[in-house]
Amino acid sequence: MTVTPRLAHFVLQTNQLPAMTQWYIDVLGAHVVYENPAMCFLTTDEEHHRVALFGPPGGGLPERTPATVGLAHTAFTFPTLGDLIDKYLQLRDKGIEPRVPVQHGVTTSLYYRDPDGNMVELQIDNFATPEESTDYMHGEEYTTDTIGPSFNPLALAEAYKAGVPESELTTRAWALKTEQINVMERMLTP
């Protein structure tokens, strides 16, 4: 059975966070769901965010290269953790490995680079409703670390198949039990 994911959000890196935030508010009629000095999440509907803007502390991003100003990634949401794991295993069997797996807390995410180097995120929402996701984003765990730790996707697949509860596997606490990589370094390099 083929599962078709749905588009979740896109992320843009910018040196002009306030101006970009206002532009998306004006152009899309979006509203701010969460923001801090380095990022802003906006939405136009019931989703916790459709547009994310990231302006690294201190700014100074050079003009567009694969790791600077412009589209950072597109994201697609799968209905269940099992569906995401199945897709991971299908891609792995074809030699397509995630560039970086991240337990954001609000989502469990696998980031891939396409042949041109564009980042594509395959994810599941870790909460049943957008309101729960938004509440989490305003909580201490998320505001302390908005990105989250990496995780080992094969270990996730094995734990899922072994019957470890999904409610445990979709937490940062579980992700931190696996080997860690530098998430931001992996996201910002080709």
UniProtKB/Swiss-Prot annotation:
CDD domains, A to Z: BphC2-C3-RGP6_C_like
Binding locations of Fe cation: 9, 73, 121
Keywords: Aromatic hydrocarbons catabolism, Dioxygenase, Iron, Metal-binding, Oxidoreductase
Pathway(s) it belongs to: Xenobiotic degradation; biphenyl degradation; 2-hydroxy-2,4-pentadienoate and benzoate from biphenyl: step 3/4
EC number: 1.13.11.39
Catalytic activity: biphenyl-2,3-diol + O2 = 2-hydroxy-6-oxo-6-phenylhexa-2,4-dienoate + H(+)
Domain VOC stretches: 6-125
GO biological process: catabolic process
Alphabetized GO MF terms: biphenyl-2,3-diol 1,2-dioxygenase activity; ferrous iron binding
Pfam families from the UniProt entry: Glyoxalase
Cofactor field: Fe(2+)
Signal peptide: none
Root EC class: oxidoreductase
Family membership noted in the UniProt record: Belongs to the extradiol ring-cleavage dioxygenase family.
PANTHER family: CATECHOL-2,3-DIOXYGENASE
Subunit structure, interactors included: Homohexamer.
Record-given protein name: Biphenyl-2,3-diol 1,2-dioxygenase 3
Organism: Rhodococcus globerulus
Lineage, opening ranks: Bacteria, Bacillati, Actinomycetota, Actinomycetes, Mycobacteriales
Gene from which the chain derives: bphC3
